[in-house]
A protein has these predicted regions:
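Flexible loop/turn segments at secondary-structure boundaries
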Residues: 1-4, 105-108, 136-138
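Alpha/beta-hydrolase-fold enzymes
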Residues: 1-59
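Active-site nucleophile elbow and catalytic-triad environment of alpha/beta-hydrolase enzymes
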Residues: 2-8, 70-88
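Conserved alpha/beta-hydrolase "acid-adjacent" motif
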Residues: 80-83, 100, 104-114, 121
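Short, conserved loop/helix-junction motifs that constitute active-site signature segments
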Residues: 89-92, 119-123
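Short beta-strand/loop motif that positions the catalytic acidic residue
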Residues: 91-92, 98-100
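Catalytic histidine neighborhood in serine/cysteine hydrolases
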Residues: 121-137
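Catalytic active-site module of serine/aspartate enzymes centered on a nucleophile-bearing elbow/loop
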Residues: 132-162
Length: 162
């Protein structure tokens, strides 16, 4: 994770960085992805999620002026305790559909999709859609996997949203 398995050390580092910034020091910005596909290749960063996220967020395909591909180290303490699925077992009472690509990457989208589906036990109608031969980032904007997903999503919404 963001703490590199040393949460106390990470928090101490963040506190020291905040103190330095408060005293006029430079901000420390952590880049979460390589700057380009070329940089990723040159540095051997070819793991599926790293490469595909870079391909999406660092190219015209998905790059946006306010795109969140970096963060201030001094404000990263929130990442240490963040749990996207906190209370999912009790709060997710509405119908739930999780759509995931079966090509697994290091960032954990497949695992997270399986987890949220598994934890949404309070939902009376939960469905899992696994798209074979597609990755998490393929589902962002590639016609074929988006079409496959929408073929499941549209009827689900028509049934539950009306």
């Amino acid at each position: 994770g963001f703490s590199m398995y040393n949460p106390i050390g990470a928090l101490e580092g963040m506190a020291a960085q905040r103190t330095a910034e408060a005293r006029g020091g430079e901000r420390l910005v952590n880049e979460l992805l390589p700057a380009s596909l070329a940089e990723a290749k040159d540095n051997g960063m070819t793991e599926r999620d790293v490469y595909e996220a870079t391909e999406y967020y660092k190219t015209p395909r998905g790059q946006q002026p306010g795109g969140a591909t970096r963060m201030l180290f001094s404000h990263a303490q929130k990442t240490l305790a963040w749990d996207a699925f906190s209370f999912a077992e009790t709060l997710m009472t509405q119908p739930v559909m999780a759509v995931i690509g079966q090509k697994v990457g290091a960032f954990g989208a497949y695992r997270d999709g399986m987890e949220i589906y598994g934890r949404a036990v309070a939902s009376k109608d939960r469905q899992l859609v696994e798209l074979e031969d597609w990755s998490h980032y393929d589902l962002y904007d590639k016609s074929e996997p988006v079409g496959l997903a929408m073929a499941q999503i549209v009827p689900f919404f028509k049934e539950h949203v009306g």
